[in-house]
Amino acid sequence: MDAKLSPNQGLNISGIGLASSLAAGLGIAALTLDWMANRNPWQGTSLTLPLLLCTIASAIAGYFVVPLLQALKTGQIIREDGPQAHLKKAGTPTMGGIFFIPVAVVGACVLSNFATEVLAVSALTLSYGLIGWIDDWQILRRKSNKGISPRMKLALQIGFAAAFCLWLMFNQPANITSIALPWVSFALPLGFLFWPLAGFVLVAESNATNLTDGIDGLAGGTVAIALLALGAIVAPTSPALMVFCAALSGSCLGFLAHNRNPARVFMGDTGSLALGGALAAVALLTNSLVALFILSGIFFVETLSVMAQVSYYKATKGPDGKGKRLLKMAPLHHHLELSGWSELQVVSSFYVIAAILAAICLAIASGGA
């Protein structure tokens, strides 16, 4: 990890080239998955059409919204103790989630004929996006990296998670509290314990994607991969949520037209909290928690790197009040940057890992079908 790498060693690709490759790869994957499932890729209830339409719509929306965000002076506050290469990003507008999240929600609702489960997941997604927007707005208003207090943010996340769980409790079959295990015809019955687990998953997933959003194109691309795979997995039991996942995946791709390196806009907490909430909500509603765990491997490692860094620092704190660090900086992607990796090396590597995790998930799903 500490090996010094030149900025483009072993990677002769630009930000737009990487984003285009991802979009092409996911487009081909969507077509292939539709073909394998005997779905018409050009009908609303598919992976391909929602992905394509929302990619285009999100990219077009960005060409109008990004200049508006610039005019409103919503420039991101950059941490001075972070990678020095990030200082040049100062002034890049944030809150990009305000355009690509609504595009996906509207697209999914229309293409699914306003299915009840899509409306519920959309409400949770927008609610978490609202929490992120409040946090982003406070950061901009105070001109610092401090938005709303962590306690307030957590309280809002738990509150919206509880509301979603209440909807699940009264509108879904009783067996939703049993977790399906792949490859075996057995479900782990959790009973009442399912509900605190569900709340934890919603809060943890949203915070994990939030921590991953630290490099141009990183969160948007990895979440797009996870969403498309999750959409394919839930398709047999919930075609409407397949459409939602494909639409949000496409909207992430459209956002990358503006967020790829060098980024013209950041998604901010407005986008990252919403994306994590969406992933968790779909998984809970479709009994796909095992799939979510695998697909979120990158987000969990990023979160664990922060937890390990903080815990080790506190455990090794001496009389002078200073402790030792496991990593040069947390989350992991910043450690890699400070170890000599370029942003494109980190992002492309994480894309490959996300694709491998998606392939593993799809293989497990097909094996258990």
UniProtKB/Swiss-Prot annotation:
Pathway: Cell wall biogenesis; peptidoglycan biosynthesis. Catalyzes the initial step of the lipid cycle reactions in the biosynthesis of the cell wall peptidoglycan: transfers peptidoglycan precursor phospho-MurNAc-pentapeptide from UDP-MurNAc-pentapeptide onto the lipid carrier undecaprenyl phosphate, yielding undecaprenyl-pyrophosphoryl-MurNAc-pentapeptide, known as lipid I. GO terms for cellular component: plasma membrane. GO terms for molecular function: metal ion binding; phospho-N-acetylmuramoyl-pentapeptide-transferase activity; UDP-N-acetylmuramoyl-L-alanyl-D-glutamyl-meso-2,6-diaminopimelyl-D-alanyl-D-alanine:undecaprenyl-phosphate transferase activity. The keyword Cell cycle applies. The gene is mraY. The keyword Cell wall biogenesis/degradation applies. Coiled coil: none annotated. PROSITE patterns: MRAY_1, MRAY_2. Its cofactor is Mg(2+). Pfam families: Glycos_transf_4, MraY_sig1. This is Phospho-N-acetylmuramoyl-pentapeptide-transferase. It comes from the Bacteria. It comes from Nostoc sp. (strain PCC 7120 / SAG 25.82 / UTEX 2576). The chain crosses the membrane at residues 13-33, 49-69, 95-115, 119-139, 154-174, 183-203, 215-235, 237-257, 281-301, 346-366.
